[in-house]
Amino acid sequence: MILSHVISDAALAITGVGAFWHFFGHLPFYNRLLWGFFLLTISLAAIAGTVQFAGYTGLELLYESLQTLASTLGISCIVVAVWAFVMNRTMQLMSFGLTLVVGVFLFVVMLLPDVRVFRPVVSSLGILLVMLLGVFGLMRRVPNALWVVIAVMLSAIATKAVSFADLFNPIDFYHYILAFSLLAFGKAVQK
Protein backbone atom coordinates (compact mmCIF):
# COMPACT_ATOMS: atom_id res chain seq x y z
CA MET A 1 0.00 0.00 0.00
CA ILE A 2 1.31 3.41 -0.97
CA LEU A 3 -0.64 5.86 1.17
CA SER A 4 0.45 9.04 -0.61
CA HIS A 5 -0.71 7.61 -3.97
CA VAL A 6 -4.02 6.54 -2.44
CA ILE A 7 -4.60 10.05 -1.08
CA SER A 8 -3.57 11.83 -4.30
CA ASP A 9 -5.68 9.53 -6.52
CA ALA A 10 -8.65 9.94 -4.17
CA ALA A 11 -8.18 13.71 -4.28
CA LEU A 12 -8.19 13.57 -8.09
CA ALA A 13 -11.37 11.47 -8.13
CA ILE A 14 -13.16 13.76 -5.67
CA THR A 15 -12.03 16.85 -7.57
CA GLY A 16 -13.32 15.48 -10.88
CA VAL A 17 -16.74 14.60 -9.47
CA GLY A 18 -16.90 17.80 -7.42
CA ALA A 19 -15.95 20.01 -10.36
CA PHE A 20 -18.59 18.38 -12.52
CA TRP A 21 -21.21 18.78 -9.81
CA HIS A 22 -20.32 22.38 -8.97
CA PHE A 23 -19.37 24.04 -12.26
CA PHE A 24 -21.23 22.29 -15.06
CA GLY A 25 -24.85 22.14 -13.88
CA HIS A 26 -25.96 25.23 -15.81
CA LEU A 27 -24.78 24.01 -19.23
CA PRO A 28 -27.14 22.62 -21.87
CA PHE A 29 -27.70 18.88 -21.53
CA TYR A 30 -25.40 17.49 -24.25
CA ASN A 31 -22.67 20.03 -23.51
CA ARG A 32 -22.80 18.99 -19.86
CA LEU A 33 -22.61 15.32 -20.86
CA LEU A 34 -19.50 15.94 -22.96
CA TRP A 35 -17.76 17.66 -20.06
CA GLY A 36 -19.04 14.89 -17.79
CA PHE A 37 -17.54 12.13 -19.91
CA PHE A 38 -14.19 13.90 -19.71
CA LEU A 39 -14.28 14.57 -15.97
CA LEU A 40 -15.89 11.33 -14.91
CA THR A 41 -13.66 9.02 -16.96
CA ILE A 42 -10.69 10.62 -15.22
CA SER A 43 -12.46 10.20 -11.88
CA LEU A 44 -13.26 6.54 -12.58
CA ALA A 45 -9.62 5.87 -13.47
CA ALA A 46 -8.57 7.66 -10.28
CA ILE A 47 -10.96 5.55 -8.17
CA ALA A 48 -9.55 2.36 -9.70
CA GLY A 49 -6.05 3.73 -9.06
CA THR A 50 -6.95 4.44 -5.44
CA VAL A 51 -8.04 0.85 -4.96
CA GLN A 52 -4.95 -0.47 -6.74
CA PHE A 53 -2.55 1.72 -4.73
CA ALA A 54 -4.36 0.62 -1.57
CA GLY A 55 -3.02 -2.87 -2.25
CA TYR A 56 -5.78 -4.64 -4.15
CA THR A 57 -4.09 -5.93 -7.30
CA GLY A 58 -7.15 -7.50 -8.93
CA LEU A 59 -8.07 -4.29 -10.73
CA GLU A 60 -4.91 -3.81 -12.79
CA LEU A 61 -6.61 -4.54 -16.13
CA LEU A 62 -9.62 -2.40 -15.21
CA TYR A 63 -7.32 0.43 -14.15
CA GLU A 64 -5.42 0.23 -17.44
CA SER A 65 -8.68 0.14 -19.42
CA LEU A 66 -10.09 3.13 -17.55
CA GLN A 67 -6.91 5.09 -18.20
CA THR A 68 -7.26 4.25 -21.89
CA LEU A 69 -10.93 5.28 -21.77
CA ALA A 70 -10.01 8.63 -20.23
CA SER A 71 -7.30 9.23 -22.83
CA THR A 72 -9.56 8.38 -25.79
CA LEU A 73 -13.25 8.94 -25.09
CA GLY A 74 -12.50 11.59 -22.47
CA ILE A 75 -10.15 13.47 -24.78
CA SER A 76 -12.52 13.37 -27.74
CA CYS A 77 -15.30 14.69 -25.50
CA ILE A 78 -13.18 17.54 -24.12
CA VAL A 79 -12.12 18.63 -27.61
CA VAL A 80 -15.74 18.91 -28.74
CA ALA A 81 -16.87 20.42 -25.42
CA VAL A 82 -14.23 23.15 -25.60
CA TRP A 83 -15.11 23.79 -29.25
CA ALA A 84 -18.76 24.25 -28.22
CA PHE A 85 -17.65 26.52 -25.36
CA VAL A 86 -15.46 28.70 -27.59
CA MET A 87 -18.02 28.90 -30.39
CA ASN A 88 -20.89 29.37 -27.89
CA ARG A 89 -22.79 26.43 -29.40
CA THR A 90 -25.37 24.15 -27.89
CA MET A 91 -24.61 20.57 -28.82
CA GLN A 92 -27.31 18.47 -30.45
CA LEU A 93 -27.88 14.73 -30.22
CA MET A 94 -26.23 14.03 -33.58
CA SER A 95 -22.95 15.79 -32.78
CA PHE A 96 -22.95 14.35 -29.27
CA GLY A 97 -23.51 10.84 -30.61
CA LEU A 98 -20.82 11.25 -33.25
CA THR A 99 -18.35 12.37 -30.59
CA LEU A 100 -19.14 9.30 -28.51
CA VAL A 101 -18.77 7.01 -31.53
CA VAL A 102 -15.35 8.49 -32.34
CA GLY A 103 -14.25 8.24 -28.71
CA VAL A 104 -15.42 4.64 -28.30
CA PHE A 105 -13.80 3.72 -31.64
CA LEU A 106 -10.50 5.21 -30.44
CA PHE A 107 -10.89 3.34 -27.15
CA VAL A 108 -11.42 -0.01 -28.87
CA VAL A 109 -8.52 0.58 -31.25
CA MET A 110 -6.20 1.60 -28.41
CA LEU A 111 -6.97 -1.65 -26.59
CA LEU A 112 -5.32 -3.59 -29.42
CA PRO A 113 -1.82 -4.67 -28.35
CA ASP A 114 -0.06 -3.38 -31.46
CA VAL A 115 -1.71 0.03 -31.30
CA ARG A 116 -1.56 0.60 -27.52
CA VAL A 117 1.78 2.38 -27.79
CA PHE A 118 0.04 5.26 -29.58
CA ARG A 119 -2.23 6.09 -26.64
CA PRO A 120 -0.04 8.99 -25.45
CA VAL A 121 -0.06 10.37 -28.99
CA VAL A 122 -3.88 10.45 -29.08
CA SER A 123 -4.12 12.27 -25.77
CA SER A 124 -1.31 14.66 -26.70
CA LEU A 125 -2.98 15.58 -29.97
CA GLY A 126 -6.30 16.04 -28.19
CA ILE A 127 -4.78 18.31 -25.58
CA LEU A 128 -3.01 20.25 -28.33
CA LEU A 129 -6.38 20.78 -30.04
CA VAL A 130 -7.87 21.95 -26.75
CA MET A 131 -4.98 24.43 -26.33
CA LEU A 132 -5.48 25.75 -29.86
CA LEU A 133 -9.21 26.11 -29.19
CA GLY A 134 -8.42 27.95 -25.95
CA VAL A 135 -6.13 30.37 -27.79
CA PHE A 136 -8.79 30.77 -30.48
CA GLY A 137 -11.23 31.59 -27.68
CA LEU A 138 -8.85 34.27 -26.41
CA MET A 139 -8.65 35.72 -29.91
CA ARG A 140 -12.47 35.78 -30.07
CA ARG A 141 -12.51 37.42 -26.62
CA VAL A 142 -14.51 34.59 -25.09
CA PRO A 143 -14.96 35.20 -21.38
CA ASN A 144 -13.02 32.69 -19.29
CA ALA A 145 -11.13 31.22 -22.29
CA LEU A 146 -7.94 31.94 -20.37
CA TRP A 147 -9.01 29.24 -17.90
CA VAL A 148 -8.97 26.70 -20.74
CA VAL A 149 -5.40 27.69 -21.56
CA ILE A 150 -4.43 27.47 -17.89
CA ALA A 151 -6.08 24.04 -17.59
CA VAL A 152 -4.18 22.73 -20.60
CA MET A 153 -0.92 24.18 -19.31
CA LEU A 154 -1.49 22.42 -15.99
CA SER A 155 -2.22 19.17 -17.85
CA ALA A 156 1.01 19.57 -19.79
CA ILE A 157 2.96 20.20 -16.59
CA ALA A 158 1.35 17.11 -15.04
CA THR A 159 2.60 14.93 -17.88
CA LYS A 160 6.14 16.09 -17.12
CA ALA A 161 5.91 14.94 -13.51
CA VAL A 162 9.08 12.87 -13.83
CA SER A 163 11.02 16.10 -14.36
CA PHE A 164 10.10 17.15 -10.82
CA ALA A 165 11.13 13.81 -9.23
CA ASP A 166 13.78 15.53 -7.09
CA LEU A 167 11.15 17.75 -5.49
CA PHE A 168 7.97 15.65 -5.51
CA ASN A 169 6.86 12.09 -5.98
CA PRO A 170 6.00 12.01 -9.73
CA ILE A 171 2.76 10.04 -9.33
CA ASP A 172 1.42 12.29 -6.58
CA PHE A 173 2.53 15.40 -8.45
CA TYR A 174 0.68 14.18 -11.56
CA HIS A 175 -2.51 13.52 -9.61
CA TYR A 176 -2.54 16.87 -7.80
CA ILE A 177 -1.69 18.98 -10.85
CA LEU A 178 -4.30 17.14 -12.93
CA ALA A 179 -6.83 17.87 -10.18
CA PHE A 180 -5.97 21.58 -10.44
CA SER A 181 -6.39 21.28 -14.20
CA LEU A 182 -9.92 19.90 -13.76
CA LEU A 183 -10.74 22.82 -11.47
CA ALA A 184 -9.43 25.24 -14.11
CA PHE A 185 -11.70 23.64 -16.72
CA GLY A 186 -14.55 24.16 -14.28
CA LYS A 187 -13.64 27.82 -13.82
CA ALA A 188 -13.72 28.21 -17.61
CA VAL A 189 -17.43 27.44 -17.81
CA GLN A 190 -18.39 29.09 -14.53
CA LYS A 191 -20.90 31.91 -14.88
Give residue spans per PLM region.
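Membrane-helix interface and helix-disruption motif detector
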Residues: 1-6, 54-66, 89, 111-122, ...
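Membrane-proximal helix-loop-helix units in multi-pass membrane proteins
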Residues: 64-133
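N-terminal topogenic module of multi-pass integral membrane proteins
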Residues: 1-61
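Hydrophobic cores of alpha-helical transmembrane segments in multi-pass inner/ER membrane proteins
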Residues: 9-21, 71-84, 126-135, 175-190
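Residues within membrane-spanning alpha-helices of integral membrane proteins
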Residues: 9, 36-46, 75-78, 96-100, ...
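C-terminal transmembrane-bundle signature of multipass membrane proteins
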Residues: 136, 140-191
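Aromatic-anchored segments of alpha-helical transmembrane domains
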Residues: 41-48, 100-111, 150-162
